[in-house]
Amino acid sequence: MLNSVKKLLGDSQKRKLKKYEQLVQEINNLEEKLSDLSDEELRHKTITFKDMLRDGKTVDDIKVEAFAVVREAAKRVLGLRHYDVQLIGGLVLLEGNIAEMPTGEGKTLVSSLPTYVRALEGKGVHVITVNDYLAKRDKELIGQVHEFLGLKVGLNIPQIDPSEKKLAYEADITYGIGTEFGFDYLRDNMAASKNEQVQRPYHFAIIDEIDSVLIDEAKTPLIIAGKKSSSSDLHYLCAKVIKSFQDTLHYTYDAESKSASFTEDGITKIEDLFDIDNLYDLEHQTLYHYMIQALRAHVAFQCDVDYIVHDEKILLVDIFTGRVMDGRSLSDGLHQALEAKEGLEITEENQTQASITIQNFFRMYPALSGMTGTAKTEEKEFNRVYNMEVMPIPTNRPIIREDKKDVVYVTADAKYKAVREDVLKHNKQGRPILIGTMSILQSETVARYLDEANITYQLLNAKSAEQEADLIATAGQKGQITIATNMAGRGTDILLGEGVHELGGLHVIGTERHESRRVDNQLKGRAGRQGDPGSSQFFLSLEDEMLKRFAQEEVEKLTKSLKTDETGLILTSKVHDFVNRTQLICEGSHFSMREYNLKLDDVINDQRNVIYKLRNNLLQEDTNMIEIIIPMIDHAVEAISKQYLVEGMLPEEWDFASLTASLNEILSVENMPSLSANNVHSPEDLQSVLKETLSLYKERVNELDSNTDLQQSLRYVALHFLDQNWVNHLDAMTHLKEGIGLRQYQQEDPTRLYQKEALDIFLYTYGNFEKEMCRYVARHLGVPENVQ
C-alpha cells in the first residue's frame, strides 16, 4: 500500500515518507516489550518522559517511545491499535504540518499521539474540532487514553462558566471548538483583573478539519459586540425604498465579491425621495449608511441560502457547513437591515468591542498542525499563511469508490430531472443514496422533484439540524435516500447497513460544483470509507450558481456552440474543461480575497498587539502606574504643540490662547508660562519655555508613587479609557476598511493607503488615551484657581 502512494507524491514528500516508515519500524520494535509492562509501569513512562524533557532532552528524542506507549495504552483502554499509517499521520502532526487523511481513516485516534507527546512539556495542548458534539466525543474517547497515562484532560465549550474554563485550560490537553478558544482570547483581553482571565500562553494546537477552520471560516472574524441603539423606522423605510431600485440603473452588484454600490441615478433617486441636496454631506452620513446596508441586505443575502427566518429571528447559515451559526449576528447595522427586509422586529445594533480573524488568532500558536480529508488543493495557502506543508497519508485499505464523470445539462430543470432518474435507478438496486446540495433552498428544490415521483427521502439542512446525528446514522441503510446540505460533508461517518456492501455501497450525488474542489471531494469522500465500495456522480447545469457568478458571459457564448440530446444533456466535451476552469478561477478569487483581507487585518493585528500588551501590563498588580503616566505627559504636550503650532503658518497666526487652555487641561501647574509669538517660534521653543514647568510638575506626579489607593484607581481608570478608545478605534477602522475599496481610482495601492490611514487613526486613538489619562491626573492633583 505504501509503495502505491509513493508514486503519487513529489520527491521531497517521498523522502519524508521513507523517514516516517523508518520511525514507524522503530515504534513497532518496541511493541512487544511495552506489552509486557503492567498498567502502573506503562503509566510511569509519563513521569520518565517529563523528567527527560526537564533534563534537556527534546520532543524528537522521546517521540518514538512515547508513540509506542500511546499505542499500547489505546489497545488496553479502547481496544484499538494504531495502524502504521496512523503512526505516520501522528508524526506529520508532531512536526507542525497537515496530515491529509480520507474519511474513515481514524483521524481522532491519530491525534492521540502528538497531543500526548507535546502535553508532556507541561504547557498545554489544544485540540480544535468543528463543533461541540465532536469536542465532547473526542474528549470522552481519546481522553480515556491520556487520563490512563496520568494526564489531565479538559473540555472548553461555550456553555461552561469561567471557573470551569480556567480548569479546562489548566489541563494538559484541552478539547473544544476553535471559535470558543478565540472568543476566550478576546474576553481575556477585556477582563477587569488577572483573576478573570482563563487562558495561559499558547503552545501547540491540533485542528481537526483544518481546511474548514482556517480557510472556510477565515472570511468571518470573531467579534465580541456591545449594543447600541438604531432607528427601526429608518431601517424599515430604507428596506421599502430599496425594493423599488433596479439593477444597473440604480445600483451595481458584483456577484464575485458580493459588493454593492449606488450609481449616480441611484444617488439622485435617494436625494429626491428624502428631499436632500447631497447624500454625501456629513449630516446625511447615517442615511447613506442605512441605505447601503439595505442594498447589501437586498442583493447580497438570500433567504434559505445565507440565512433562515426562525421564530421571527434571522439566523445566519454557514455556507460551507450548511449549519446555523448560533449566537452570531452581522455587525454595523447589516443584521438590522436583514430584519427590516424580512419585516421582523428590529433588534439593537452591535458595536464591536473586540475582534480578531481566525487566521491571526491561530498564527499566535508557536506550533500548529491539523488533519483533514481534503487539503492538498489549498497547499499553497497553508504554506504562505501558516508555514505548514500538506502530507497525504496512505490509506489503510485501498479506496475502491468509483467517481463517475460529471454530467452537465443546459438548464437546472433538466439537471434535477436527471438527478431524479439517477435516484430511481440506484434506489431500485437497494443502495443508500446521499444527495449533496449547496443550500437549504437547493435541498428543498431537490425534495420537490423527488416528491413529484413519490420518492421517500429524509431531509437534512439547518432547519432540521437537531436530527443530524439520527439522520446520518441511518443514511447508509439499505434503500435510504438522504438529501443534505454541506452538513453531511464532515464529522460523523456514514456506516453501511447490513447487505449494502454487496449492493455496491453508498451512492453520492452532487447537484452543483462548490466554489472549492475541496468541498466536492469531501462530499465524494462520504462514500468508499475504509475500503468500502461506493460511487459518486455530479449533476451540473449552465444555470448553476458558480457559473452565473464567475462566468456568465462565457456561458452565453458557449451555449451557442453546444450539442445536446433530447433531455438537455450537453454532449460537447469542452464543457467539462470550462467548468473545471471556472472552479479554479473561483478558488483563485476566494484566495485573493482572503489574502487581501489578511493584509488589511495584519495592520489592525499589530495595533491590537500593542493595545493588549499595554492592557495586560495594566492588569499586573505590581505595575507602577506613575512610571507609565510620566512619559504620557511628554507625549501629550508634544501632541498638543503639533496641533496648535501648525507647520507652514507664521507664529503670529498660531492660536496661543487655545494652546494654553489645552496645556492647562493636562498640567496642574500654579503658574503656566505666558506663551506668545514673542517667545515661541517653533515646537522646540515651546519645549524650552515649558522645561522647568514640566520638570516641577512631573516631580509632583512622582510624589504620588507611594499612594497605593491612587495606584489602584489609576489602574481602573486607565483600563476604562483604553477600552473606550479601542472600541471607538475599531469603529473607525471598520469604516476605513469599507471605504478603502472605493478609492482605488487614486494612483495608490489601496493596501498601502489603508496602512497609512490606519496608522494615523491609531496614533490619534493612542494619543487621545494618553491625554485623557493626563487630564485625570491633573484633576486629581487639583488645578489651582490662580492659573494664569
Curated annotation (Swiss-Prot):
It comes from Bacillus anthracis. HAMAP family: SecA. This is Protein translocase subunit SecA 2. The keyword Cell membrane applies. ATP binds at Q86, G104, E105, G106, K107, T108, D493. Keywords: ATP-binding, Cell membrane, Cytoplasm, Membrane, Nucleotide-binding, Protein transport, Translocase, Translocation, Transport. Part of the Sec protein translocase complex. Interacts with the SecYEG preprotein conducting channel. Has a central role in coupling the hydrolysis of ATP to the transfer of proteins into and across the cell membrane, serving as an ATP-driven molecular motor driving the stepwise translocation of polypeptide chains across the membrane. One of its GO terms (molecular function) is protein-exporting ATPase activity. One of its GO terms (cellular component) is plasma membrane. Belongs to the SecA family. Its main location: membrane. The keyword Nucleotide-binding applies. Its EC number is 7.4.2.8. It catalyses: ATP + H2O + cellular proteinSide 1 = ADP + phosphate + cellular proteinSide 2. Pfam families: P-loop_SecA, SecA_DEAD, SecA_PP_bind, SecA_SW. Monomer and homodimer. Part of the essential Sec protein translocation apparatus which comprises SecA, SecYEG and auxiliary proteins SecDF. Other proteins may also be involved. It is a peripheral membrane protein. InterPro entries: Helicase_ATP-bd, Helicase_C-like, P-loop_NTPase, SecA, SecA2_Bac_anthr, SecA_CS, SecA_DEAD, SecA_motor_DEAD.
